[in-house]
């Protein structure tokens, strides 16, 4: 089972919250105290809560579930994409478009258009167009890829959301809540934990902390997927030699 230790979290700076004047009182149970005007998060809470979240992620993946990694702020976007790709899951790393989950029918049409343009860009269709028309389609393709590239092969709504920055991604969390999709989210001291099923109290700005979360989540998803493949192999009559 994938787990993260307190030492890992301390080294990554998970315990450093926001300045005390920006705090959200709903995070009080998870705050240890303050140092130099900055809230310190109580890792005695974070460690077991994150490990519980990782067990949940692993369980979702073991049932062939789809996990959507969400992190659109600059500090998180690269790590979110890398983690999702590494475990064959899905991601939104640029901008959350309102209705991405709650208006899936419309999003599906945009994904269809994205795939059409991808095909046209490689099958010679673009070469037959005027320069202006080809440029317009290339720009449309780039725009759609930026927004929907991480979910174009999701094939339906996800079974869980893994979110970096509950405050920044509040629209995504609200949409998931409306649809009954469970949410795992890193919640800093300035954010509200409302609507988050698996709260991970921690720093959501430091690159090292973000990478700790995303890499652990990807490892947990891979471990879960491995369990699924092992069960499948057993059912198919393939048992790995000791």
UniProtKB/Swiss-Prot annotation:
<protein>
    <recommendedName>
        <fullName>Small ribosomal subunit protein uS2</fullName>
    </recommendedName>
</protein>
<dbReference type="InterPro" id="IPR018130">
    <property type="entry name" value="Ribosomal_uS2_CS"/>
</dbReference>
<dbReference type="Pfam" id="PF00318">
    <property type="entry name" value="Ribosomal_S2"/>
</dbReference>
<keyword id="KW-0687">Ribonucleoprotein</keyword>
<dbReference type="GO" id="GO:0022627">
    <property type="term" value="C:cytosolic small ribosomal subunit"/>
</dbReference>
<dbReference type="GO" id="GO:0006412">
    <property type="term" value="P:translation"/>
</dbReference>
<comment type="similarity">
    <text>Belongs to the universal ribosomal protein uS2 family.</text>
</comment>
<dbReference type="GO" id="GO:0003735">
    <property type="term" value="F:structural constituent of ribosome"/>
</dbReference>
<dbReference type="InterPro" id="IPR023591">
    <property type="entry name" value="Ribosomal_uS2_flav_dom_sf"/>
</dbReference>
<dbReference type="InterPro" id="IPR005706">
    <property type="entry name" value="Ribosomal_uS2_bac/mit/plastid"/>
</dbReference>
<keyword id="KW-0689">Ribosomal protein</keyword>
<dbReference type="InterPro" id="IPR001865">
    <property type="entry name" value="Ribosomal_uS2"/>
</dbReference>
């Amino acid at each position: 089972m994938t787990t993260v230790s307190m030492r890992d979290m301390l080294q990554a700076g998970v315990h450093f919250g926001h300045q005390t004047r920006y705090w959200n009182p709903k995070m009080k149970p998870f705050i240890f105290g303050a140092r130099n005007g900055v809230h310190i998060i109580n890792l005695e809470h974070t460690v077991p809560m994150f490990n519980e979240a990782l067990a949940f992620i692993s369980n979702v993946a073991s049932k062939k579930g789809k996990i959507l990694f969400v992190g659109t702020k600059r500090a998180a976007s690269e790590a979110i994409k890398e983690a999702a790709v590494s475990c064959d899951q899905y991601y939104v790393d640029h901008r959350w478009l309102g209705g991405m989950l709650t208006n899936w029918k419309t999003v599906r049409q945009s994904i269809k258009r994205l795939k059409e343009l991808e095909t046209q860009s490689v099958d010679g269709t673009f070469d037959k167009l005027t320069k202006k028309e080809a440029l317009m389609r290339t720009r449309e393709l780039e725009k759609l890829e930026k927004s929907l590239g991480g979910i174009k092969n999701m094939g339906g709504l996800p079974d869980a959301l893994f979110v970096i920055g509950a405050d920044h991604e509040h629209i995504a969390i609200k949409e998931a809540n409306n649809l009954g999709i469970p949410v795992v989210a890193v919640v800093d001291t300035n954010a509200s934990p409302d609507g988050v099923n698996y709260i991970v109290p921690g720093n959501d700005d430091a690159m090292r902390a973000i990478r700790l979360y995303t890499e652990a989540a990807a490892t947990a998803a891979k471990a879960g997927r491995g369990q699924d493949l092992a069960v499948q192999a057993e059912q198919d009559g393939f048992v790995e030699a000791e």
